[in-house]
UniProtKB/Swiss-Prot annotation:
Pfam families: Glyco_transf_5, Glycos_transf_1
Record's keyword annotation contains Metal-binding: no
The organism of origin for this protein: Streptococcus equi subsp. zooepidemicus (strain H70)
Record's protein name: Glycogen synthase
Annotated GO biological process: glycogen biosynthetic process
Keywords for the protein's UniProt record, in alphabetical order: Glycogen biosynthesis, Glycosyltransferase, Transferase
Keyword Endoplasmic reticulum among record annotations: no
Pathway info: Glycan biosynthesis; glycogen biosynthesis
Entries under SUPFAM superfamilies matching the protein: UDP-Glycosyltransferase/glycogen phosphorylase
Recorded catalytic activity of this chain's protein: [(1->4)-alpha-D-glucosyl](n) + ADP-alpha-D-glucose = [(1->4)-alpha-D-glucosyl](n+1) + ADP + H(+)
Enzyme kind, highest EC tier: transferase
InterPro entries associated with the record: Glyco_trans_1, GS/SS, Starch_synth_cat_dom
């Protein structure tokens, strides 16, 4: 099977979040199953700086972006047996950042047109074309409405994945003619119209052969007004082709037995290195070195989505317990200031690191006993899976991917990989934490069982990719 991914970002070339992780890992796993896999990405300046000496110039052509005749350079790099093609146009992609420019609509309209036309130029016509988030959401529409006359494209089956429904790509409908070079008819008949805007994500949901989200629970949630961000009606209408597949994590990269960032390695069979890692982290962050105190980690963007309003609401109560908290992340300035204030008020209990530091993040996963992730909504979430891999037991709000990946501890059956609360409130966050602390202090055998279950749960992409393969095969 020939499978092609088109996305706005992908590790290790350009990455801002979970989408980049998926594009970096899923194709590798599909190749292991014997399939030909190709990825099309924009050639950003960050890609040029890090990989410019490795890429190969393949060809160039010009495409029409409405009335504009734009250069399209095609560059190529084979990595981990996956063939990456890059769309090169410095005017659009050498901006110093991936997203956030005033003309993002034009930039990604160009990218989608160039990617579609590039397939024929490079001679790669996939069986499955898998596009991701709003930046590539018009591709299924364009294949069926603008490029349907190209015979080679008629057998392509399309899959669209929603990583976060909050970002839908809503633009002025004049863009259809001005950038995509198609008529206004599909907007006027309501197909592409949503709240008096051209909605790229709606186009993908209607025109793609299959629609997926990054967890089964999120696939259900986005069909409700509470989580559908205005598209819940469309999601319910197309529910027959909607499904959820949980993301995986790179288990080679996130492996406490071989992680170069940890001062001591450990595994589910031998946890002695975890105690040593905890001691080193306490020393590094200026916390009292105590093996017996529960160390609670938080590695996240500091935003409302991640539930930090609950943490701040309850923090003075939590810090009355015999615990230590370690925070790593940046985000809302109000949250940054609040956690910095608490760290100064409770220097022996809270270390607030308002930055992003990957080695420190790995050490927090490796050192902590508990990991706090009370997200208000979470399409999938990766941090909770990384934490479990390192024996840091997650405390989560049972929503979206958190509900699908963390099995709440059952004291009677002695099962579970973490602790969860159903109602999004500070009270239940604190009650769940107190329950977890009771197990940690007073039921050591049960705690070790939870750790064993968490560390040995299979979150590998090799397993997650099988669900995608089943989906692809169902289309052929």
């Amino acid at each position: 099977m020939k499978i092609m991914f088109v996305a706005a970002e992908g590790a290790p070339f350009a990455k801002t979040g979970g989408l980049g992780d998926v594009i970096g890992a899923l194709p590798k796993s599909l190749v292991k199953n014997g399939h030909e896999v190709f990825v099309i990405l924009p050639y950003y300046d960050v890609v040029d700086q890090a990989f410019g000496h490795q890429v190969e110039d393949v060809l160039y052509f010009y495409t029409q972006v409405g009335w504009r005749r734009q250069y399209v350079g095609i560059k190529k790099l084979v990595k981990d047996k996956v063939t990456f093609y890059f769309i090169d146009n410095q005017a659009y992609f050498f901006r110093g950042r991936i997203y956030g420019d005033w003309d993002d609509g034009e930039r990604f309209a160009y990218f989608q047109l160039a990617a579609i036309e590039a397939m024929e130029k490079i001679g790669v016509i996939p069986d499955i074309l898998h596009v991701h988030d709003y930046h590539t959401a018009m591709i299924p529409f364009l294949l069926k409405e603008k490029y349907h006359w190209i015979q080679a494209y008629q057998a392509i089956r399309t899959v669209f994945t929603i990583h976060n429904i909050a970002f839908q790509g809503q633009f002025d409908p004049g863009m259809l003619g001005d950038l995509f070079g198609v008529g206004i008819g599909r907007y006027e008949d309501g197909t592409l119209r949503w709240h008096d805007c051209l909605n790229w994500m709606k186009a993908a949901v209607l025109y793609a052969d299959r629609v997926t989200t990054v967890s089964p629970s999120y696939a259900h949630e986005i069909q409700t007004p509470a989580f559908g961000q205005g598209l819940d009606q469309v999601m319910r209408m197309e529910a027959g082709k909607l499904s959820g597949i949980v993301n995986g994590i790179d288990t080679d990269l996130f492996n406490p037995a071989r992680d170069p960032h940890l001062p001591a390695s450990f595994s589910a069979e031998d946890l002695s290195g975890k105690a040593a890692t905890k001691q080193v982290l306490q020393e590094r962050l200026g916390l009292p070195v105590r093996a017996d105190v529960p160390l609670i980690g938080m590695v996240s963007r500091l935003t409302d989505q991640k539930g930090f309003q609950l943490v701040l609401e309850e923090l003075s109560h939590i810090l009355q317990q015999d615990v230590q908290l370690v925070l790593l992340g940046t985000g809302d300035p109000d949250y940054e200031a609040a956690f910095s204030w608490f760290a100064k008020a409770y220097p022996e209990k809270l270390s607030a690191n308002i930055t992003f530091d990957l080695p420190l993040a790995q050490q927090i996963y490796g050192a902590c006993d508990l990991f706090l992730m009370p997200s208000a909504f979470e399409p999938c979430g990766l941090s909770q899976m990384m934490a479990m891999r390192y024996g840091a037991i997650p405390i989560v709000h049972e929503i979206g991917g958190l509900k699908d990946t963390v099995a709440s501890y059952n004291a009677y059956e002695k099962t579970g990989t973490g602790f969860g609360f159903d109602q999004f409130s500070g009270f239940w966050l604190t009650q769940t934490l107190l329950f977890a602390l009771d197990i940690y202090h007073n039921h050591k055998e049960d705690w070790q069982t939870i750790q064993q279950h968490a560390m040995t749960k299979d979150f590998s992409w090799d397993t997650a990719s099988l669900a995608y393969l089943d989906l692809y095969k169902s289309l052929l």
